[in-house]
From Swiss-Prot:
It holds the Pfam family Phage_integrase. GO terms for biological process: cell division; chromosome segregation; DNA recombination; DNA transposition; resolution of DNA recombination intermediates. It comes from Chlamydia trachomatis serovar D (strain ATCC VR-885 / DSM 19411 / UW-3/Cx). The keyword Cell division applies. This is Tyrosine recombinase XerD. Keywords: Cell cycle, Cell division, Chromosome partition, Cytoplasm, DNA integration, DNA recombination, DNA-binding. It comes from the Bacteria.
Length: 300
């Protein structure tokens, strides 16, 4: 290993501890931050912390542009750098933090499933011939939980038996913050059906496992498996590109369309900033405009 590579490795190790312990950031977010920072150290040829300055940031941005990275990717990398520079200053490894100006990003509005598409999607697992009834029960519970609560895929995978009550689920979100999210009667029924059948059998393979959603080996279900199951069912009902996050978008937009308060939706989604939730008001507005052009007498 070269001296510069060794320097990068040690710096990233210290940064990892800062993110995990001091900031309480989830392992996946820590990994993403560290990948972006390591790329900065490599592209800007940083061999010592005193080489980190405004010029090195400009050089990094220039190389990102040459690599034809999107503005969204660049913005994410710069956010990671801002946190990294704060860490260095706190650790007295950097006298002055370089100024970072975030690029303006055009936010693409998410493609939203209609109520009819969601209902069709929710029905898929229990209506497919020859699909193992136990797997169908689990997948139905997953789909209902996503749409009923709007939680993230990582939050669903992390759900434990003790997190579920009759009316709420306790969700551990970004920054390990917990929140209580109401759950619908149908979603609770789907979860109970799964818990009383398939999960009880699976837990025999791994008695100490406390997570709700398990693989056929009795282990905690991972994000990639959930992603594959959702896309499998989605292809049966729509040509739209659907992911677990699509059900989160549908949850928020359908609540707004039915006049739910934006602040309540923000709380249920676990957004720290209202601006993250406001994107759904634009989606709801697009839906309103579409209905106007469909039903207004002068447009018929």
């Amino acid at each position: 290993m070269t001296p510069s590579a060794l320097f990068h490795k040690r710096l990233i190790e210290q940064f990892t501890i800062f993110l995990s312990v001091d900031r309480g950031i989830s392992p996946l977010s820590v990994q993403a931050y560290c990948q972006d920072v390591l790329l900065f150290l490599q592209r800007a040829s940083i061999e010592a912390t005193d080489r980190i300055n405004q010029e090195s940031v400009f050089l990094f941005v220039e190389k990102c542009h040459k690599a034809k990275e999107s503005e969204t990717t660049l913005a994410r990398r710069l956010i990671a750098l801002k946190v990294f520079f704060h860490f260095l200053k706190d650790a007295k490894m950097l006298d002055q933090q370089p100024f970072i100006e975030h690029p303006k990003i055009w936010k693409r509005l998410p493609s939203i499933l209609s109520t009819e598409e969601v209902n069709s999607l929710l029905d898929q697992p229990l209506n497919i011939p020859n699909l193992d009834t136990h797997i169908a029960s689990r997948d139905a519970a997953i789909l209902y939980t996503f749409y009923a609560t709007g939680i993230r895929v990582s939050e669903l995978c992390d759900l434990c038996i003790g997190d579920i009550s009759d009316d709420f689920i306790r969700v551990t979100g970004k920054g390990r913050k917990t929140r209580l999210v109401p759950i619908s009667i149908k979603a609770k029924q789907a979860i109970d059906a799964y818990l009383s059948s398939f999960r009880d059998e699976l837990q025999k393979k791994n008695p100490s496992e406390e997570h709700v959603f398990l693989s056929i080996r009795g282990k905690k279900l991972d994000r990639s498996c959930v992603w594959k199951r959702i896309t499998f069912y989605a292809k049966l009902v729509t040509t739209k590109r659907i992911s677990p996050h699509s059900l989160r978008h549908a949850f928020a937009t359908h609540l707004l369309n039915n006049h739910a308060d934006l602040r309540i939706i923000q709380e249920m989604l676990g957004h720290s900033r209202i601006s993250s939730t406001e994107i759904y008001t634009h989606v709801a507005s697009e839906s309103l405009i579409e209905k106007f052009h469909t039903y207004h007498p002068r447009d018929i």
